[in-house]
């Protein structure tokens, strides 16, 4: 392999420091920002966002300060079909997606990687907090970042062996505070920029408003049901609800009520008390295994069912292109559409998209 790399630059501090570190290692680098929005109003600049027009200028400034060529690649068509359309389709079908995983899978480590190869560059470099290592058998492993509070391995479980072999995460061995110190020492204008928090194409965290505006559809009101199927109120459209949600229900009850299930076919949302949200068996499809080629028999792992979830012990089995995890303890508000990611301590075994919960 050569020492030529493409640095995916979002305009944030992490990707900027990743670029600096790669230059320090002697790599021949070019900086790239992916243009994701054909309609710039979708990616409008706002606090805690990424990939807006302002972010392009920040990334360009950092690349210039590092004496590094910089380009903007237009991936807006692919972003629309593989991220936004999938996001909307999921909510319309009562599923809660993770668009960051789709963006990594279809853009950063697929489309951008393909473009890097066309440019005769062997590596894609990002500012993710994770690590890639090679085991004694020549298999590439995805590992958690040393800074567990910033670890992003959950949203990277979809990387293949080929992609991992051409990926570098320079920040995997450091803490966020160290990254900011480097950015300040280099005079980067984004050194104190806040971390991105929300979905990049959703303003003010209102994903339902985004879906209505983007599609031009009106999603009709329907019935709230209790767990016995009795009507207990009216909801404002199924796209506004996800499993475990409490806010915005507008229902009075002796105890707090939460969303237990969303059924777009009947246009109903089932509510339950907190103790009705727990489940122990989680099945996932569209799987990708990293540390092993397949799971034979039963495997003891720690597993996560959402990004901000602490891994919990489970026994996992594989059946063709699906995996099933049986948790030692029931887990709260497990949601179809999110990822089930398996860990062998700090190593990602693999994962998949949750398709069934019991």
What are these regions (language model features)?
Residues 1-157, 168, 177-178, 184:
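ATP-dependent adenylation/nucleotidyltransferase module used to activate substrates
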Residues 127-133, 139-358:
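AMP-forming adenylation/ATP pyrophosphatase catalytic core
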